[in-house]
């Protein structure tokens, strides 16, 4: 055996179900033999199979011979192991038989011992306490009977007398321990039953009474456990029943013999108030008999919060199922009902405390003093805070707080509910338990949602149950087993922080009543008031509304495309607008309207909200001004836009704002603001100017702009070439004007009393409700600044159109002099610069018509014909000589501009006829010019006519100075002026 143990040979190849192994091979052989048609084929198949078998036999012999030594070792070992296994089985069988014999012997001995012990105990009990036990054993049955009839005073007296006997003369008797324990257990059970009945009276019935007034029917009250049997009874029966109940209450208030007292049946308890008073008195009297007054007081005080939570949960469920709040705000209705229920419960607590005081004096109870209604309302505020925590979604916004590890009073349990909740993970869950038997059914409706609070709620409920279970002597941890479960909460609507805006004013009314109940001193608000104030300031405003305002400004300041993105056509229609606005402006206006609604909903925080609004508007003002500078200011600082530079000139700006067309436009804008709802989409024209006044105004403007134009002209870099830039400026103007109007309306609304649509502002907000005049003034000034920016944009557009006329129609003399002579352009077409100008004017009109109000487009293009006419006439100053082709080209220029401007303004621009008539004069001889002036009258200035005479003389080769002087003298005589000095402009 010194040789190493044999090793298991490697496992051979496992053949599959193919032709060379197992049954598959045999089947194939049978098939091949079956399909063979001749004996020769079968013989060949046989030989083939025999050859295969020979090869297999040879391989088997080879393997056996190769592993002969190992096989020789394995076979003896196998025989040895087999024999040892057989011997072990025989030994185990013998042990099993021996164990069976021992078991039977022990069973026989145990029965004998048990029988002897039971006989001895029974004999002892029978000899010592048979008669006493027989009497005491009747007590449990009597207690059960009294309890079934709800005669709690009789049951309490029977238990108290029996326990007094057991703890007195029979205290040393050990055989009565079971009976004593049973009676103590029954006393505890009766105490639990009485406590449940008291809770039902104080909380359930009081709450149902308040709930029934809200619901359509009083079925819940009719089905109440203590108000059964309110059937149709005669008035005399009702009077007699009420008299018996009042008599019983009067007897209980004094010392009375229970055996002689009249038993009041449930059928006699007709009126809920008498029923409640009677049962409360009965239960408190029973507590006094059972010596449970201190325990019951402590349990009631500790359990106020839990029972109020149950009332809230039950009421929420009832309102959700009945659909009573379908047409109103569900949370408002819920709060209204709950507060009425709390007041009814507080009234019942007041009655309960009076009975406790009477019973405590009657039985000389020594223990803790009864709680008062201040304690109740403190717990009620905690429950309301829990309710608001659920609906305001505070767990997702509250800051991290450390959980309290211990507390002395259950009233401090409320702090555990305000721990930060874990934010739900966005990852998909790996497992689902929706098919598990432990998963409850869920209602997917929006109005009825139920879920469990997290582990912090469970810990609170466990601590509360521990407090209840540890109260009183002999109390067990299972006093209120339902308290061990996690508290389920039912929501009547989806949690949302914005709900505070709908419930704030009603809540403030409830808080005022609570502070009156608790007799809070001025400047010392109740805890619910502090909770609501802290939530609104620290969470709803700081982390909600104010944060949204800051994010809006940050997004606008970082987004470069915010000044190019306009609102959609659907938004234009929704806002009752006719022109597009910047999306950023509408976004800020929405934030403004949100704040306006918040001021109406939260009037006590109007100053805080207005401070944030002013900061928002100031930041947006800076952004808008920066956007305006980005539009009109080129990249290079040494460049300038001519129209912007003109507008910065105070004289030009003041002159434009004093013109009648500007004042008329602003007057119309102000009227349209006041009458937007009545005259939307139309306008009543103000007092129209006469044609002469319009002509004089346009001439004044053209003269002023011409006089301020430099000698060098206007280059391509000094104009806004891109139409898209002008369109952006127009949209900015329209947006700023609209936004200014909205801000002004908002400021004007602040002057009126802030009243919510549901309730007037509560008195406690009176000190803060008046918005300061300084704040309103700041808002008004901001509105004026936005309006001023809109005016600036409009004036820039007004001047830019005129600057481009100067740019395209007035070039340097070196460029314009005789530029038409030898030109390759079609002589029947206007000048190329004029063609470019007319095209740009049409493009600008198209852009402005799509972005500006028609009155503003009219203001931009009105008077442009007078300026163009003046520029065309002044262009003659740069002509060295005149010919027919030049005159025709200049006339076509005037006609082209006239057609374009007439299409834009929808009126024939007669001012350009003057330019055409001027160049027609240049084709005449000097005498003809003077005769034409005598016949038609003059419509040009003296300088223009002098220039025309000089060009005419050059054209006809007149160079005699005396003749030129005579023509000038004749012109002066015609004009009635002094002789000219011969200066040509």
UniProtKB/Swiss-Prot annotation:
Positions in coiled-coil regions: 36-70
Signal peptide: none
Keyword Iron-sulfur: no
Modified residues (Phosphoserine): 235, 456, 459, 682, 686
Top-level taxon in the UniProt lineage: Eukaryota
Region described as Disordered: 434-480
GO cellular component: apical plasma membrane; basal plasma membrane; cytoplasm; exocyst; growth cone membrane; membrane; plasma membrane; presynapse
UniProt KW keywords: Coiled coil, Exocytosis, Phosphoprotein, Protein transport, Transport
Keyword Protein transport attached: yes
Expression sites (tissue/organ): Abundant in the embryonic and larval glutamatergic neuromuscular junctions (NMJs), pre and postsynaptically.
A Gene Ontology biological process term: vesicle tethering involved in exocytosis
Pfam families xref list: L27, Sec8_N
Knockout mutant characteristics: Flies exhibit defects in development of glutamatergic neuromuscular junctions (NMJs): increase in synaptic microtubule density.
Primary role: Component of the exocyst complex involved in the docking of exocytic vesicles with fusion sites on the plasma membrane. Involved in regulation of synaptic microtubule formation, and also regulation of synaptic growth and glutamate receptor trafficking. Does not appear to be required for basal neurotransmission.
Family: Belongs to the SEC8 family.
Subunit structure: The exocyst complex is composed of Sec3/Exoc1, Sec5/Exoc2, Sec6/Exoc3, Sec8/Exoc4, Sec10/Exoc5, Sec15/Exoc6, exo70/Exoc7 and Exo84/Exoc8.
Protein name: Exocyst complex component 4
Phylogenetic classification of the source organism: Eukaryota, Metazoa, Ecdysozoa, Arthropoda, Hexapoda
